[in-house]
A protein has these predicted regions:
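Structured beta-strand-rich core segments of catalytic domains in phosphoester-bond hydrolases
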Residues: 41-107, 111-116
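N-terminal, active-site-proximal structural segment of metallo-dependent hydrolase catalytic domains
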Residues: 1-57, 61-75
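Active-site beta-strand/loop signature of hydrolases that rely on acidic residues for catalysis
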Residues: 28-51, 113, 123-149, 180
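Metal-dependent phosphoester-hydrolase catalytic domains
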Residues: 128-135, 142-190
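Acidic/His-rich catalytic or pseudo-catalytic neighborhoods
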Residues: 5, 15-22, 93-134, 138, ...
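Hydrophobic pocket-lining residues within nucleotide cofactor-binding pockets
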Residues: 1, 45, 116, 142, ...
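Histidine-centered active-site loop/cap adjacent to the catalytic His
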Residues: 29, 119, 176
């Protein structure tokens, strides 16, 4: 499956117009603004111009990092972040994942954006071996059978248990994408 950017033009297969594109950007920015998060991971963006337009449309003052990956589907990863709160120091694009490391407050935090569930296991295993001091957050597709084994907790589990999700399978909602956070990180909710 490969997505061709030319499909998203007025002459392309999907007949995208400037107004349709502007509506997509506005709606995406509105969702991001409603969450008011210092870090926002995006997967499946068409190109850097889309990321630039989303960041500009947000009320928050987001900086961004965009990477085109060597994947067959042509989709890219991006990270929107508040530059006064998060300072990226390293990024490593791979096949269907992007790893971004940086300073968040006094912590060194590693963000693994995964578009492939199997890849998440390898990325987590390697990062824990190579960079054990980094507080890890895994975002996206993940099939880690026991996140606790890697010092991670599933921040999406409670919502899924409450019947919320992103895909419906077997008559129930499930989270297709996960947020696995290092147990050493704390939030206002613990």
């Amino acid at each position: 499956l490969f997505y061709d950017d030319a499909d998203y033009t007025p002459e392309g297969r999907l007949h995208w117009t400037a107004e349709r594109y502007a509506r997509k950007i506005r709606n995406t920015a509105a969702v991001i603004d409603s969450m008011a998060l210092p870090l926002v991971a995006l997967w499946g963006v068409e190109n850097e111009q889309v990321v630039r337009d989303i960041a500009a449309a947000c009320r928050g003052d987001y900086s961004y990092l965009h990477r085109t990956l060597n994947s067959l589907d042509g989709m890219d990863f991006a990270l929107l972040y508040y530059g006064d709160l998060f300072y990226p120091t390293r990024d490593e694009p791979g096949r269907r994942y992007l790893y971004v490391e940086g300073e968040l407050g006094r912590d060194t935090v590693g963000l693994a954006l995964c578009g492939d569930a199997r890849m998440a296991q390898w990325v987590v295993r390697d990062l824990r071996a190579e960079r054990p001091h980094v507080k890890l957050i895994v975002l996206g597709r993940s099939d880690l059978p026991d996140p606790g084994r890697w010092g991670l907790r599933d921040a999406t589990r409670r919502a899924e248990q409450a019947g919320r999700g992103t895909v419906r399978r077997g008559g129930r909602w499930q989270m297709r994408d996960r947020i696995l956070a290092d147990t050493a990180l704390t939030t206002s909710e613990g």
